[in-house]
Amino acid sequence: MTQSRLHAAQNALAKLHEHRGNTFYPHFHLAPPAGWMNDPNGLIWFNDRYHAFYQHHPMSEHWGPMHWGHATSDDMIHWQHEPIALAPGDDNDKDGCFSGSAVDDNGVLSLIYTGHVWLDGAGNDDAIREVQCLATSRDGIHFEKQGVILTPPEGIMHFRDPKVWREADTWWMVVGAKDPGNTGQILLYRGSSLREWTFDRVLAHADAGESYMWECPDFFSLGDQHYLMFSPQGMNAEGYSYRNRFQSGVIPGMWSPGRLFAQSGHFTELDNGHDFYAPQSFLAKDGRRIVIGWMDMWESPMPSKRQGWAGCMTLARELSESNGKLLQRPVHEAESLRQQHQSVSPRTISNKYVLQENAQAVEIQLQWALKNSDAEHYGLQLGTGMRLYIDNQSERLVLWRYYPHENLDGYRSIPLPQRDTLALRIFIDTSSVEVFINDGEAVMSSRIYPQPEERELSLYASHGVAVLQHGALWLLG
């Protein structure tokens, strides 16, 4: 029965792929062959390949019964699609194989995922059953379901997105949950095997009324600290912060097995753009801590649906720590995308300076002299619908998009650093922009939807001059 469901899903995906439109389909970001994609799942290095699984609906460009899509890569940049790994339909995952993680259990690729069942009609979140399940594979492609390995505590329905790792000769698992008082929390379990688990403690929880669910947890050490990474739902916007439908971020602290997680800071968003959710981390083959997120947002219009697909992932980002601050940089493998190079000489800009007439897939590096630039606004623009600019009056870096025909507009912004220069590394794809600020001190990621004739890339300044100290551009392929 499982194989017939996988076969039906693969056939449906193939039919959808035949009619997929490519106006917004990315050149160098992982996206589904067709259909729907959301959370990254099961990121792992296994059998000399990187594996990225993801939440996938192969029958439609809309969210639906969740399958696990699958892609592999040699370098985390160039991805090859593989057969669908998991399809829902068993008693414990009848309505969805929800998010989870992957581990190498003595040469067996093991997927730990949430089995989801609607108890009172699809979409009624007040009546669900969620359990943690296991599926295994020796070749990394074909998986056998092993059934339920963990059920929720009494009184908890929302219980999902297991992240598993091994430490101190013990398996550990964090699971996102909503407690009976409608407050988000992360539960910690320990296991002698992937099939036998014991509750350890509530690792962290929201304050009353702060958020009603904590999804997609991850827990890892980096530098001198541990980081709890998760996606809270129900946070209220505060000024420039928490403006998206849902957030994703980290809480730093200290932890060792058997002890409390001693938090040393507050929740901080990982990405300050419009579109970033459900990040998951893993270790590269050389031990680097890498994170990939879903570069979309719930309840966003997603114009690519008209062309038979929706959703894509961010570039793989290397995490590091400096002076207690978490940094995110594109993995160095991203440089393999570079093709034609174009230098951008230092200059003073007072109007518009065109870099590319038709920028499809580019990387741009810019270093602005903040102290010597007096323009009210200055920065980079793509067509008339996307601007990344310094606002001298508010002293903020602003990522603005304006696609009224797609019902998409608005901006996200962060404070300018208290220094003389601002260094930006920007990746523009067919329908996305990712901005790495000051060597990874901050990141802003957003989906953009310019029409083919709206891809002129230029620098600009208004009401004054802007001083560019350094610039470079590469066409990517």
Model regions: which residues?
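Beta-rich accessory regions
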Residues: Q10-L16, G249-G477
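Repeated scaffold domains used in trafficking and secretory/extracellular systems
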Residues: E215-P217, P279
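Beta-rich carbohydrate-recognition and catalytic domains
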Residues: M1-D161, R166-S211, S221-N272, G293-V344, ...
